[in-house]
Structure formats: structure tokens, C-alpha cells
UniProtKB/Swiss-Prot annotation:
<dbReference type="GO" id="GO:0042752">
    <property type="term" value="P:regulation of circadian rhythm"/>
</dbReference>
<comment type="subunit">
    <text>Interacts with MAPK8IP1/JIP-1, MAPK8IP3/JIP-3/JSAP1 and SPAG9/MAPK8IP4/JIP4. Interacts with HDAC9 and MAPKBP1. Interacts with ARRB2; the interaction enhances MAPK10 activation by MAP3K5. Interacts with SARM1. Interacts with JUND; interaction is inhibited in the presence of MEN1.</text>
</comment>
<feature type="modified residue" description="Phosphothreonine; by MAP2K7">
    <location>
        <position position="221"/>
    </location>
</feature>
<dbReference type="InterPro" id="IPR050117">
    <property type="entry name" value="MAP_kinase"/>
</dbReference>
<keyword id="KW-0067">ATP-binding</keyword>
<keyword id="KW-0449">Lipoprotein</keyword>
<keyword id="KW-0539">Nucleus</keyword>
<dbReference type="InterPro" id="IPR008351">
    <property type="entry name" value="MAPK_JNK"/>
</dbReference>
<dbReference type="InterPro" id="IPR008271">
    <property type="entry name" value="Ser/Thr_kinase_AS"/>
</dbReference>
<keyword id="KW-0963">Cytoplasm</keyword>
<feature type="region of interest" description="Disordered">
    <location>
        <begin position="405"/>
        <end position="464"/>
    </location>
</feature>
<feature type="short sequence motif" description="TXY">
    <location>
        <begin position="221"/>
        <end position="223"/>
    </location>
</feature>
<keyword id="KW-0418">Kinase</keyword>
<dbReference type="GO" id="GO:0006468">
    <property type="term" value="P:protein phosphorylation"/>
</dbReference>
<feature type="modified residue" description="Phosphotyrosine; by MAP2K4">
    <location>
        <position position="223"/>
    </location>
</feature>
<feature type="lipid moiety-binding region" description="S-palmitoyl cysteine">
    <location>
        <position position="462"/>
    </location>
</feature>
<keyword id="KW-0496">Mitochondrion</keyword>
Length: 464
């Protein structure tokens, strides 16, 4: 099964349909009708309206206007909208069939809980969550309202970035990852399509549906992220720690430099071959850590010496050196050489990457050392429930949010300037976009493949 994402570079025409449901029994007398109407009038009549968006119907609060579809994926459909209460543009994600099965329900619960807990400038902010249904029995739709960004990293990768922008984007990626790691959350699904940016070079990480607390190592599955960005320990089924995210950042950085995917494997085997052809066959010490069957296969592959990093990433691929003495090709290449290390034990940590000369020019303790998120459900990833039990848990979360956010704001954050989608320019398609549209679902966690928000592109402006 493939995922197909929709791109809208110009304003689409929508067939907008306003639907108010009444549903009375024609045999009931007038007094009964009046009583029924007064007592059972749906929330939809008072607060909501419905809009046809492609093959889906969005039933949203009236405060959200001018809905425009901007993306779709395995986990839902995303629309841009104007929030009349906050006077800003937002993204509204309708979760796709969240109660289809236990895996969908668990993922929906996990995403909702994590988004409510995490509060960092480099992680997408949850502004609101709601459902148009008024009872648990009717409950079937979940809408997440988030910040609206200008583009995803797929589009930015095709741009000629100078060292300042490249370094600043990487710094923000690492800040967001460190914040997640501080709560024991390993993202595991980092890729260009779930990292979004604004025209002022602000970067945010999306999606926590695949995030899993670090303590569940004994149940780790190798089928977690888009293949091109999978770390060797994931490909080889070794288990993983925080360094799995550093490998993904290295792959993204390398793609920024080369403007093409570093390791475009067609399968796990091909992916491993692509890695060792460029980086070399790992040492026997690493091989000893592998399971016997995997080790037997890996040791019987052709041996590769690998290429040096100056050959993998020659100066000609980098932008001209910055006036800043640390933002140079040599420093960028050194960082790549520390991130793209097959053995996770020898791979650079997030903390050390943030101290690297190519990155620490932006170092701000308030961003790097932000208080860790408090995950109130400590058994988030160990929970196992029936679909109905998951449904009740999610319903309680939504009702709790609605109660706390009568004015529609879950996290009290200032409205960023320039939040509108900039769709006046169209960027070349990214190689990573091709990855998304043709991505096969290996034995993922039952549709735990991708739910990225695909935003319209806008040019990157100046860094701070």
C-alpha cells in the first residue's frame, strides 16, 4: 500500500456544504418535537458546521474558516484554516478512522497525550483539540488544531542553503530532539516530510504517533521509520537508543548538502548495502552485537572499505564559507562524520552535537535546556486496551481539553508573526517527496507509516 500526498500551490476551489442535522421522528407530536429539539439539540447545530474536503467531511467549530486541504496521509487529512478567535492561520488535522483497530486507537491516544505534554518552540504546538460529537456513544472524530507552517523540509532541501541557514535549521532540529529525549521519548520517525519550517527559518518537528518511551527496548520493532533515514541498528534489529535520531539528522543534513537521498534503499538488504558501500563494512567488534542470523548474513556480504568524508562530501557540494570562522565546509563535514557512524556507541550524542562548532554558534540555554515535558501517563507505551477502552480514554482526553480550553487555546503561546501559508512560490519537488509518495508499508505497526502535514512552500528568510 502506498501513501499519496496532495500538494496545493494555489488556492483550491472547495465545494462547501453547510449541514445542520435535525433527524426528528415524523410521528412525534408538536410538543414532543419542541421538547426533543430543546433537550437534544446537537453541538453541531450551535458551534459547528460541515465542509466537504475531497472525499472527507470536516465538521469543525465555526471559529475555523476558509478551510483548504494541504495534505493527507495514513493517519489523517490536514486543512489550513483561519482561526477567527486567535486571528491567525492554523492547521487542522482530522484523524483518519482512529478507532478502526487497536493499533490506530493506541496511536491516536499516544499522539494526543504527547502533543498535550510537549511544549517547546521547535516542536509543533497543539492549539486545540475537539470533537463534534457530544457523547461517548457517538464519538468517532478527533480534530487536532496546530500551528500552520510555510513548508516542510522536503521543499527546503532542494534550495541552495548558505551555512547560516543550514546550521540554524540543524540546531533547531537538535533542540527539539533533546527536549523529547529529556522525557525519555525517542522520535524514531524523523525525516524531511515531518519537519516543517517558516519563512523566517523557524523549524518545528511534527508527529509523535511513532514516538515510544525509551524504556521499552525489549519490544522494539525494526519497522518504524521511512527506510531512507533508518539507522543501522534499526535495520539490523539491534534495538536502539537516543542515537537513532542522530543518524536521521545526519541523513537529513547530508541530503541538504547533496540535494539527494544518501541511502535510497529499495529494501532492508539494499538499504544496508547502500550504507556500507559509502561508509564501509563495520568492524568485528560491531558484528559481535548482532543476532546470529543477522550476523551470518552481514559477515557474508562483500567487504567495503568505504569512502572518506572529503570524498563523500567534497567542498564543491557546500555553500561558500561564511564570514563566521566556524561555519565552513570543513566544520559541516566534521559534524556529518560524527553523525553518520554505523556503530551507535561511537556516534555523537545530541548534547555533543549541540556543542559542535558548526552548531553551537546558536546555543541558547533557554532553548537547549528547556524544562523536560511531564508525561502524565507513565505507562503510555505499555498500555494495552480494547478498541472501546481506547475510545473512552481518548474521549476523556478530548473532553478534558475542551473543558480547559473554552477559548480554544491548549498551550498559552504567543501567535507567531507570518503564520499564513505562503503559496505564491512553488519549489522544485524534493527527492524526499518521492520517497513519501511511493513508500511501501513494510510490516509497520498496522498503518503506522506516515501522517505528516504537507505544507505549501515559502522561501526561507533570514535567520535570527
Amino acid at each position: 500500500m502506498s501513501l499519496h500526498f496532495l500538494y496545493y500551490c494555489s488556492e483550491p476551489t472547495l465545494d462547501v456544504k453547510i449541514a445542520f442535522c435535525q433527524g426528528f421522528d415524523k410521528h412525534v407530536d408538536v410538543s414532543s418535537i419542541a421538547k426533543h429539539y430543546n433537550m437534544s439539540k446537537s453541538k453541531v447545530d450551535n458551534q459547528f458546521y460541515s465542509v466537504e474536503v475531497g472525499d472527507s467531511t470536516f465538521t469543525v467549530l465555526k471559529r475555523y474558516q476558509n478551510l483548504k486541504p494541504i495534505g493527507s496521509g495514513a493517519q489523517g487529512i490536514v486543512c489550513a484554516a483561519y482561526d477567527a478567535v486567535l486571528d491567525r492561520n492554523v492547521a487542522i488535522k482530522k484523524l483518519s478512522r482512529p478507532f478502526q483497530n487497536q493499533t490506530h486507537a493506541k496511536r491516536a491516544y499516544r499522539e494526543l497525550v504527547l502533543m498535550k505534554c510537549v511544549n517547546h518552540k521547535n516542536i509543533i504546538s497543539l492549539l486545540n483539540v475537539f470533537t463534534p460529537q457530544k457523547t461517548l456513544e457517538e464519538f468517532q472524530d478527533v480534530y487536532l488544531v496546530m500551528e500552520l507552517m510555510d513548508a516542510n523540509l522536503c521543499q527546503v532541501i532542494q534550495m541552495e542553503l548558505d551555512h547560516e541557514r543550514m546550521s540554524y535549521l540543524l540546531y533547531q532540529m537538535l533542540c527539539g530532539i533533546k527536549h523529547l529525549h529529556s522525557a525519555g521519548i525517542i522520535h524514531r520517525d524523523l525525516k524531511p516530510s515531518n519537519i516543517v519550517v517558516k519563512s523566517d527559518c523557524t523549524l518545528k518537528i511534527l508527529d509523535f504517533g511513532l514516538a515510544r518511551t525509551a524504556g521499552t527496548s525489549f519490544m522494539m520493532t525494526p519497522y518504524v521509520v521511512t527506510r531512507y533515514y533508518r539507522a543501522p541498528e534499526v535495520i539490523l534489529g539491534m534495538g536502539y537508543k537516543e542515537n537513532v535520531d542522530i543518524w536521521s539528522v545526519g541523513c537529513i543534513m547530508g541530503e541538504m548538502v547533496r540535494h539527494k537521498i544518501l541511502f535510497p534503499g529499495r529494501s532492508y538488504i539494499d538499504q544496508w548495502n547502500k550504507v556500507i558501500e559509502q561508509l564501509g563494512t563495520p568492524c568485528p567488534e560491531f558484528m559481535k552485537k548482532l543476532q546470529p542470523t543477522v550476523r551470518n548474513y552481514v559477515e557474508n556480504r562483500p567487504k567495503y572499505a568505504g569512502l572518506t568524508f572529503p570524498k563523500l562530501f567534497p567542498d564543491s557540494l557546500f555553500p561558500a564559507d561564511s564570514e563566521h570562522n566556524k561555519l565552513k565546509a570543513s566544520q559541516a563535514r566534521d559534524l556529518l562524520s560524527k553523525m553518520l557512524v554505523i556503530d551507535p556507541v561511537k556516534r555523537i550524542s545530541v548534547d555533543d552535537a549541540l556543542q559542535h562548532p558548526y552548531i553551537n554558534v546558536w546555543y541558547d540555554p533557554a532553548e537547549v535546556e528547556a524544562p523536560p515535558p511531564q508525561i502524565y501517563d507513565k505507562q503510555l507505551d505499555e498500555r494495552e486496551h480494547t478498541i472501546e477502552e481506547w475510545k473512552e480514554l481518548i474521549y476523556k482526553e478530548v473532553m478534558n481539553s475542551e473543558e480547559k480550553t473554552k477559548n480554544g487555546v491548549v498551550k498559552s503561546q504567543p501567535s507567531p508573526s507570518g503564520a499564513a501559508v505562503n503559496s505564491s512560490e512553488s519549489l522544485p519537488p524534493s527527492s524526499a517527496v518521492n520517497d513519501i509518495s511511493s513508500m511501501s508499508t513494510d510490516q509497520t505497526l498496522a498503518s503506522d507509516t506516515d501522517s505528516s502535514l504537507e505544507a505549501s512552500a515559502g522561501p526561507l528568510g533570514c535567520c535570527r
